[in-house]
Amino acid sequence: MASDHQSPATKQQQPSSKIVLFEQENFQGRCHELSGPCTSLKEAGMEKIGSILVHSGPWVGYEQQNCKGEQFVFEKGEYPRWDSWTNSRKSESISSLRPIKVDSQEHKIVLYENPNFTGKKIEIIDDDVPSFHAHGYQEKVSSVRVQSGTWVGYQYPGYRGYQYLFEKGDYKDSSDFGAQHPQIQSVRRIRDMQWHQRGTFHPTN
């Protein structure tokens, strides 16, 4: 079920995960450190998030409490203001966070035109694809099957627009991965930086 992909299960968190949230831009003001899931940053004392420092991760933030709404993927690094973690719209709202489990060196994802894994598809193995159109796939994406690895899909080419986190499992409909419209035009792997493999992609009918 879709809820399985979004539930902040402590069993799946990485022990080394660490993120620091700052109230103001450029790492100023009050800060709050997390090493595990937080379903309500407001209840934890963080009314507003102005900047983020990821010591180890990766993490996924959500616009709403209880890991719902628009998603924001954070990998190790600095995010000094809101537009460094989103380019879909001006959204400064992050209400919940959880670590992302990355435990596979292999990455394989299949994206389908229609719900329930039907219609045209594009299969991607160990590769990042900044534009589906450039590789001959111009269809919508209504369902996704992640066979291995952890991925983030984007609404537009060049890793722009709304972000959608894909962990291992089946997403039978676009609502399962939090999309209002079945539109994904680029995808990349979330991985530890020591894993470098040249990959392949296979658009198929």
From Swiss-Prot:
Region Connecting peptide: start-end pairs: 102-106
Modified residue annotations for N-acetylalanine: A2
Keyword Repeat included in the entry's annotation: yes
Molecular-function annotations in GO: structural constituent of eye lens
Post-translational modification: The N-terminus is blocked.
Region of interest (N-terminal arm), ranges: 2-16
PROSITE patterns associated with the record: CRYSTALLIN_BETA_GAMMA (PS50915)
Any one GO BP annotation for this protein: visual perception
Signal sequence coordinates: none
InterPro entries from the UniProt entry: Beta/Gamma-Crystallin, Beta/gamma_crystallin, G_crystallin-like
Domain Beta/gamma crystallin 'Greek key': 17-56, 57-101, 107-148, 149-191
Region (C-terminal arm), start-end ranges: 193-205
Keywords annotated in UniProt: Acetylation, Eye lens protein, Repeat
Notes on the domains: Has a two-domain beta-structure, folded into four very similar Greek key motifs.
Function: Crystallins are the dominant structural components of the vertebrate eye lens.
The family this protein is said to belong to: Belongs to the beta/gamma-crystallin family.
Self-association and partners: Homo/heterodimer, or complexes of higher-order. The structure of beta-crystallin oligomers seems to be stabilized through interactions between the N-terminal arms.
Descriptive protein name: Beta-crystallin B2
Organism: Aquarana catesbeiana (American bullfrog)
Lineage of the organism: Eukaryota, Metazoa, Chordata, Craniata, Vertebrata
